[in-house]
Each structure stands twice: as structure tokens, then as C-alpha cells.
Regions:
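Sec-dependent signal peptide recognition
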Residues: 1-9
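Glycine-rich phosphate-binding loop signature in dinucleotide/nucleotide-binding domains
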Residues: 82-84, 140-144
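Conserved nucleotide-cofactor-binding alpha/beta core module
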Residues: 125-127
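Sec/Tat signal peptide C-region and signal peptidase I cleavage site
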Residues: 16-20
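A short, acidic, amphipathic alpha-helical segment used as a generic capping/interface helix at domain edges
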Residues: 129-140
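Generic beta-sheet signal
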Residues: 34-36, 144-150
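Active-site-proximal alpha-helix that buttresses catalytic centers in soluble enzyme cores
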Residues: 21-112, 117-121, 161-185
Length: 185
């Protein structure tokens, strides 16, 4: 039994070293710039949006709660503390994305190609949005990082990865996932 405990302790410490090394590499890459940084909006309880959804009326949308707002602050703090250079922050027009961007970064621009296409109402927009996202990235020549605050479905489609709320997903300009960082809520 004692041998099993020793093996378990060694395994856990090696796992933590590997994880820390990977995280250090991710941070180094972020600090160099030239990355796409997708952020799934911070925690907003529930799933999807109500049937009466109106893009101009936040009361008809699923929104951040206090936990999501705190998570947004943690996202901003992560970028500041790690001195991650940013060219531009762009966001979906959905209120939960705008609020995440506003709290974490203050300044941002809205881009409709980052809007959700989760519901049947918006699913028809998926192909055009992905084309426009790729065109935008192709024309981006920033030396720092491009931050994209968006939705699960957009990130999943763009980089083939399923992010948690508030998760940071790093990709290159070819949308190859380079790493991810989870921000607790």
C-alpha cells in the first residue's frame, strides 16, 4: 500500500510539472504575439437563448450573472498580470459577450461574424460567418494578439475545440489550436 502511495505521489507531481511546462509555453507564446485568442463568454447560467431573443434587447437574452462578471474580471486580470499584448478585442453582438469584453478589456469592437448560430433561428448564418471570420483573420496583420470574445459554437467550428465558459483558446492564423487556459468561475 505504501508503495502505491509513493507511485501515486510521483505520478501526480510529474503530471503537474508537465502541465506547468505546457502553461509556461502557452504564456511565452501569448507574450510573443501574433495569435488568435478566442474567449468563450464568461459564465451565463442556462443554455441557448429564449424564443423572444432580440439582439438589441439584453432582457431577452441569456446574460452573465455575478459569477460570470467576476470571471470576466479574472480574465482581464490574467491578461494584465501576464503582460499579454493585444492589438484588438472583437466581440459577438450578444450581450453576454459584450459584457465579458467590456469587463475584461474595456475597449472592443463588435463583429457579427462572431455571433452565435446555436439556435435554429441563426443556424443558416454559420457558413457565411465562418467565411467572414477567416477573411478577417487573413487580413489581420497585427504583431500582438487578436482577442475574439464569442460563443461555444463559433470556437468549436473555428478550432475544433469545445471550450468551457470563460475559457481562453489560443490558435494560430490557420485556426490550429495551440493551447487553452481555463479561468475558474
Amino acid at each position: 500500500m505504501r508503495l502505491l502511495n509513493i507511485i501515486l505521489i510521483i505520478f501526480l507531481s510529474l503530471t503537474n510539472e508537465i502541465k506547468a511546462g505546457s502553461e509556461d509555453q502557452i504564456l511565452d507564446n501569448l507574450q510573443k504575439g501574433g495569435n488568435l485568442i478566442f474567449i468563450r463568454h464568461a459564465y451565463a447560467p442556462g443554455g441557448g437563448d429564449p424564443d423572444n431573443f432580440d439582439i438589441k434587447d439584453c432582457t431577452t437574452q441569456r446574460n452573465l450573472n455575478d459569477v460570470g462578471r467576476e470571471q470576466s474580471k479574472k480574465i482581464g486580470k490574467f491578461f494584465k498580470e501576464n503582460k499579454i499584448p493585444i492589438d484588438l478585442v472583437i466581440s459577438s453582438e450578444w450581450c453576454r459577450c459584450k459584457e465579458t469584453a467590456s469587463i475584461a478589456f474595456e475597449n472592443y469592437e463588435l463583429k457579427n461574424f462572431l455571433n452565435s448560430f446555436y439556435s435554429a433561428k441563426f443556424a443558416k448564418n454559420k457558413k457565411l460567418q465562418m467565411i467572414n471570420l477567416k477573411k478577417y483573420v487573413d487580413n489581420w496583420d497585427g504583431k500582438k494578439n487578436l482577442v475574439l470574445v464569442t460563443h461555444y459554437v463559433v470556437i468549436s467550428e473555428a478550432v475544433n475545440y469545445a471550450p468551457s465558459s470563460g475559457e481562453i483558446v489560443i490558435a494560430d492564423k490557420n485556426f490550429k489550436k495551440l493551447g487553452n487556459i481555463e479561468i475558474d468561475y
